[in-house]
Amino acid sequence: MDYNSTRSFTMTLAHRAVGDTRRGGFRQLRNYVDMCATLAKNQQQKDFFAYAQKALQRTDSCYYSLIHRLLDSVDEDRICTVGVNMGFGGLIYGASELKKQADLEGQPIAWITAARCGDERLSELLPKAARHGSFVWLLDATDTDPAQVVLLAKANPQSAFGLLADPSALTE
């Protein structure tokens, strides 16, 4: 399957997982984590899901309240979009593309890119980076208006963004 088909399938699975977890509770979440652990291909993925399995074994795990709060307060589409953009786009597909490039060039390439908001080159850099497999960004807006991130996110819907900003600068 090509990137877009696989991403679309992954998004469908993410929506199903969120819905099942909302309806069936954390047992469903553990089932999905177990399934992903079984399907994990490389060692980093296996390690990640082994850690997730271990964290979810304890019924008093702090992750349960965090997940419950997330499911209660965040729109399902946003949960799935961020999860797919970061998980599939950034850590699976993107990381694999970046590794191929790094092997060719003989030097590692980061899977997350940090930049300052207000940099005029960002609107050109994001699509170019995505073509090479880089979909995850950390943008610093501590000295600028964070509104640019909204425009960048709308223009690059397959990327995931983290934002450093003064909370008082954020509005709906």
Residue ranges and their predicted role:
Residues 38, 150-151:
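Short, charge-rich amphipathic alpha-helical segments embedded
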Residues 39-115:
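N-terminal [4Fe-4S]-dependent radical SAM core
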Residues 125-129, 152:
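Generic structural signal for hydrophobic
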Residues 84-89, 121-125, 146-147, 172:
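Well-ordered, non-membrane alpha-helical segments in soluble/globular domains
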Residues 110-120, 129-145, 156-172:
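Core AdoMet radical
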Residues 100-103, 124, 168:
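Polar/charged alpha-helical tracts
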Residues 1-63:
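Long terminal accessory regions outside catalytic cores
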